A protein has these predicted regions:
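Binuclear metal-dependent phosphoesterase catalytic core
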Residues: 1-46
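Extracytoplasmic/lumenal domain signature
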Residues: 39-71, 76-152, 156-193, 197-225
Length: 225
């Protein structure tokens, strides 16, 4: 299938539903007038959320923690701790066994991309145009690196080097101990939001410019695209 988005155009008298595939014109496939009543008075409201499927399969909750905002990123595990960012810009560490909050670090804006940790340092990006390195033990900031655009990409750490893309159309390699940039590649013409693959001496990633890139992991030079 093709990658794209659903778009709802709301006007004073109607709602139009469109599909926008990447690289193609927007296509309208449904429209509804905003006149009269668009609901059934006799209909029974659905209970939400519906947990009945848990009874069917015997699922039991080990622990559940209510956050302060939407969680769009995947958690990352190091030892008995897991780390996850949220829409309020907070990176939180939890005890995996019981869900107890261990510490919390606040960035200036939302955290969308997946974090990663190695050797006691958690690395993640934020929409405040910053890449952070914080202690996995207590959440204290060790370093930060400013960028020229929101950092919504996921992090990959290999042998003390963090690879992360950003919305300034750059892929970066950062020393996780010092926060210093080892190299950056600026040949991208679209946002980078994925977690790069590091294999066979290459950093491989895709971007919103419909392109897959392979860079030399040691110096960031382009191998192919």
């Amino acid at each position: 299938g093709k990658n794209g988005y659903g778009i709802y155009d709301v006007t004073e008298d109607s709602i139009k539903v469109c599909t926008q595939n990447i690289g193609e014109p927007k296509k309208e496939w449904a429209a509804f007038p905003l006149k009269g009543e668009l609901f059934d008075h006799n209909a029974k409201a659905n209970e939400y959320p519906d947990y009945s499927v848990n009874k069917q399969y015997g699922v039991k909750v080990k622990w559940c923690v209510k956050g302060e905002g939407g969680i769009y990123s995947s958690p990352f595990k190091e030892d008995n701790r897991l780390f996850v960012g949220d829409d309020t810009g907070k990176l939180t560490a939890y005890n995996i066994k019981n869900g107890k909050r261990l510490w919390q670090f606040s960035a200036q804006r939302r955290i969308v991309g997946d974090c990663a940790a190695e050797n006691g340092i958690v690395v993640f990006g934020s929409a405040d145009s910053t890449v952070y390195g914080v202690s996995s033990a207590n959440g204290k900031m060790i370093w930060k690196l400013k960028t020229q655009g929101p950092v919504l990409g996921a992090v990959r750490i290999v042998n003390g080097l963090a690879y992360i893309g950003a919305s300034d159309n750059k892929m970066r390699c950062i020393d996780t101990k010092t926060g210093k940039e080892v190299w950056e590649y600026s040949g991208v013409t679209g946002y980078i939001v994925t977690r790069p693959l590091v294999t066979d001496g290459k950093v491989i990633f895709g971007a919103w410019d419909n392109t897959l890139y392979a860079l030399d992991a040691s110096n960031g030079s382009e191998v192919w695209k």
